[in-house]
């Protein structure tokens, strides 16, 4: 079988910030909102990213 992937060093917030830097504010906000939609909950990290992605 396949081995488990290696642990990732980037946090969710860092990932959203990278998306903001690479693709812009709108993409980062949509990316963050879709994360909450996929996990069916609104977590504090998602709210922080939505509030801060345009700063």
From Swiss-Prot:
GO terms for molecular function: metal ion binding; metal ion sequestering activity. It is found in: Cell membrane; Secreted, Cell wall. InterPro entries: CYSTM1_HM_Tolerance, CYSTM_dom. It is a single-pass membrane protein. Pfam families: CYSTM. The chain crosses the membrane at residues 24-40. PANTHER family: CADMIUM TOLERANT 3 (PTHR35470), PROTEIN CADMIUM TOLERANCE 1 (PTHR35470:SF12). Belongs to the CYSTM1 family. Confers resistance to heavy metal ions (e.g. cadmium (CdCl(2)) and copper (CuCl(2))) by chelating them at the plasma membrane of root cells, thus stopping their entry and reducing their accumulation. This is Protein CADMIUM TOLERANCE 1.
């Amino acid at each position: 079988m396949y081995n488990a992937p290696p642990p990732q060093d980037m946090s969710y917030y860092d990932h959203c910030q990278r998306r903001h830097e690479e693709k812009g504010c709108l993409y980062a906000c949509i990316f963050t909102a879709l994360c909450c939609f996929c996990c069916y909950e609104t977590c504090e990290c998602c709210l922080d990213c939505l509030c801060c992605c345009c700063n």
